[in-house]
């Protein structure tokens, strides 16, 4: 009767949904960060649901894992909005590539200095391919315009989200750094959540994956890329 039960699952496609469902029913639950599970290497060659469950149980019993930080409801929905905006950004990048590829295939060469300026857009709209090719280009350009307008609207909405009481001051502080604007600042805040959960700057750098790698011995020094060490 005095036993304390805890359940857990690996971070993945389920997100936080299962966690919220379990905790809402008074079930103690944690989400395990896969890279911190000390048993994970043993399952590279053999992977079954039963084996995965056994590994999770061992990690929970022996505390051989780090729990995933659970964001607040506001942080979680803001993170989803930022992810949706980034999806549109990628879609815009793709349609730009498709338009340029279309022009290249049909030998339309722009003599200006830069693509996607007002002059370049005007040039694209002035092209007059024959028959169905004209319709294809028009559809590409319509998609480009729609995505550009939508991205501008989403960025304005992000500015509004960043002005909320829980984000306003922190966003202003982060924007003091060169290269950081509202979108990046807000992304950092909702991803990190509580900065006080990091005991030191080293821990925070490790979380971000910004620790310089090194492979040195004796007088020889080799600098490597950034890591989560």
Which ranges hold each PLM region?
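A detector of single, family-specific signature residues
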Residues: 1-229
């Amino acid at each position: 009767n005095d036993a304390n039960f805890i359940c857990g699952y690996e971070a993945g496609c389920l997100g936080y949904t299962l966690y919220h469902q379990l905790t809402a029913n008074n079930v103690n639950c944690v989400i395990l960060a896969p890279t911190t599970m000390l048993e994970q290497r043993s399952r590279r060659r053999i992977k079954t649901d039963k084996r995965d469950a056994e590994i999770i149980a061992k990690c929970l019993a022996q505390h051989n894992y780090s729990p995933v930080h659970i964001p607040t409801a506001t942080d979680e929905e803001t993170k989803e909005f930022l992810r949706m905006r980034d999806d549109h950004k990628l879609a815009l990048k793709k349609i730009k590539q498709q338009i340029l590829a279309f022009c290249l295939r049909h030998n339309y060469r722009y003599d200006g200095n830069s693509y996607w300026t007002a002059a370049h857009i005007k040039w694209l709209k002035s092209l007059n391919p024959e028959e169905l090719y004209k319709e294809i280009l028009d559809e590409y350009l319509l998609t480009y315009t729609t995505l550009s307008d939508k991205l501008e609207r989403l960025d304005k909405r992000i500015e509004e989200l960043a002005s909320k009481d829980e984000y306003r001051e922190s966003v202003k502080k982060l924007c003091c750094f060169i290269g950081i604007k509202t979108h990046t600042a807000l992304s950092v805040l909702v991803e990190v959540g509580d900065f006080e959960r990091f005991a030191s700057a080293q821990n925070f750098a490790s979380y971000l994956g910004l620790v310089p790698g090194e492979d040195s011995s004796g007088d020889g020094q080799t600098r490597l890329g950034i890591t989560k060490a």
